[in-house]
Amino acid sequence: MSEQTANKETRGFQSEVKQLLHLMIHSLYSNKEIFLRELISNASDASDKLRFKALSNGDLYEGNADLGVKLSFNEAANTLTISDNGIGMSREDVIEHLGTIAKSGTADFFSKLSEDQSKDSQLIGQFGVGFYSAFIVADAVTVRTRAAGSEKDQGVQWHSEGEGDYTIEDITKESRGTDIILHMREEGKEFLNEWRLKEVIGKYSDHIGIPVSIWAVEKDEEGKDKEGKWEQVNKAQALWTRSKSDIEDAEYQEFYKHVSHDFADPLTWSHNKVEGKNDYTSLLYIPAKAPFDMMNRDHKSGLKLYVQRVFIMDDAEQFMPTYLRFVKGLIDSNDLPLNVSREILQDNKVTQSLRSACTKRVLGMLEKMAKKDDEKYLTFWKQFGQVLKEG
């Protein structure tokens, strides 16, 4: 169903999208800030797609190959804007990506949803909700976009209040890429704050390979706003994506403290990039000292999980057996399937394969230590021998 005046059209959402929006608005996410992770991740993907397409058509850059994500907010207007200069979307793309879920078996899948939120959140795991997570914090969302390589008058504006329909119209947009404007509801207003945004970006997007910047406004002596400027918040290069030969021991040790919140240096570590059936990088550390609750089997353990440099979760215990629960570090996979909130890993062959590889890697490190450094291995055994015996 659609109703059109000139180039403005009102279209109904596919029924499954309505269900998904209902779940977002009555949020199955305990953690509201992840909307930002999802939207920045999408912006990063749009940049990756542009980079890929520009390999065969450099004109798509339109003279600007400096890709990035920019965030700005307006407290008076109650809006947060996330902008990228990636691949952008045409009108057809917008209808396909923001009005429907174009996946086979969708209706059958949604018919299985119950009213049990925890079960639904796991079921929905076969879906990427990405963009729709904006409705966790916003009561209306406006998207302004233009596909790379298209004329400036071929921009598109999409708007929805998360109910049954959305409007779409043609606009003129000077720059390629996508602006997502969130009209924040009451519980989203905490994100209209420079320091809160920096905190979330630092937490989830530090290791995305493109700059994420915030429009920062300083105050003068009278407390009035001075001229603002774009300020890059993330590091924009993940340590584990760098070549091992370029990373100093001190950097590995510092990074260990960052991921483990430990104050001491680790005993040893292993950094590996694997390409083949599964593409992933692992950076695994063996600590020098056991935490005080080591023998508690409910002790939070596991690796940090990233997918394509985007932080997904802490304590992903699926990649280590419990007898190696002292291992710290991360795994960065290019092809893991994740559930909707990315908080529960699907138990599948990829997960099992990575678990097996990481386990072998750790046991190999310990074997090498036992052969080459008695003193270090003795330190390890005193701290973790009892746990290792569980295996």
UniProtKB/Swiss-Prot annotation:
Q: Which domain of life is it from?
A: Bacteria
Q: Where mainly found?
A: cytoplasm
- Disulphide bonds annotated for this chain are none
Any one Gene Ontology MF annotation carried by this entry is:
ATP-dependent protein folding chaperone
Output the SMART domains linked to this UniProt entry.
Answer: HATPase_c (SM00387)
A GO cellular component annotation here is: cytoplasm
Q: Where does the UniProt annotation locate this protein?
A: Cytoplasm
Keywords of this protein's UniProt record, alphabetized? ATP-binding, Chaperone, Cytoplasm, Nucleotide-binding, Stress response
Belongs to which family?
Belongs to the heat shock protein 90 family.
Its subunit composition reads: Homodimer.
The free-text function statement in the UniProt record for this protein reads: Molecular chaperone. Has ATPase activity.
Under the heading PANTHER family, the entry gives: HEAT SHOCK PROTEIN 90 FAMILY MEMBER
Write down the NCBIfam families for this protein, in alphabetical order: PRK05218.1 (NF003555)
* Protein name in UniProt: Chaperone protein HtpG
Highest classification ranks of the organism: Bacteria, Pseudomonadati, Pseudomonadota, Gammaproteobacteria, Vibrionales
Gene name in the database record: htpG
